[in-house]
From Swiss-Prot:
One of its GO terms (biological process) is DNA transposition. It holds the Pfam family HTH_Tnp_1. Gene3D superfamilies: Homeodomain-like (1.10.10.60). GO terms for molecular function: DNA binding; transposase activity. Belongs to the transposase 8 family. Disulfide bonds: none annotated. InterPro entries: Homeodomain-like_sf, RD_transcriptional_regulator, Transposase_8. This is Putative transposase YkgN. The gene is ykgN. It comes from the Bacteria.
């Protein structure tokens, strides 16, 4: 004879009553008409130390790490953007540099 099959939602709710609300395993098992052995097994499987919670915390740690890296890279990009503009608010491109040199040469020739 096999035991009853309970849905996942029922199991997680039973575990929440013990873990989150602080009820005793015996009282929850009696109220829900299940064995304490089953409830202990569910707590082990769905409780706060279960592998799904560890995976979620690992994923959250990865998200935090990626957010820090994104901020660092964004800050570096912003610094480089600011460095690309010289003191007279013109882009430091080779064309602008050559144009200014040519302009200075033309001005110096006209003065002489």
């Amino acid at each position: 004879m096999s035991g009853k099959r309970y849905p996942e939602e029922f199991k997680t709710e039973a575990v929440k009553q013990v873990v989150d609300l602080g009820y005793s395993v015996a009282s929850v098992a009696t109220r829900l008409d299940i064995t304490t052995h089953s409830l202990y097994a569910w707590i082990k499987k769905y409780g706060p130390d279960s592998s799904t919670n560890k995976e979620q915390s690992d994923a959250q740690a990865e998200i935090r790490r990626l957010q820090k890296e994104l901020k660092r890279v964004t800050d570096e990009r912003d610094i480089l953007k600011k460095a690309a503009v010289d003191s007279i608010c013109q882009c430091n491109t080779p064309f602008n540099y050559l144009f200014r040199c040519f302009e200075l040469q033309c001005l110096s020739r006209s003065v002489v």
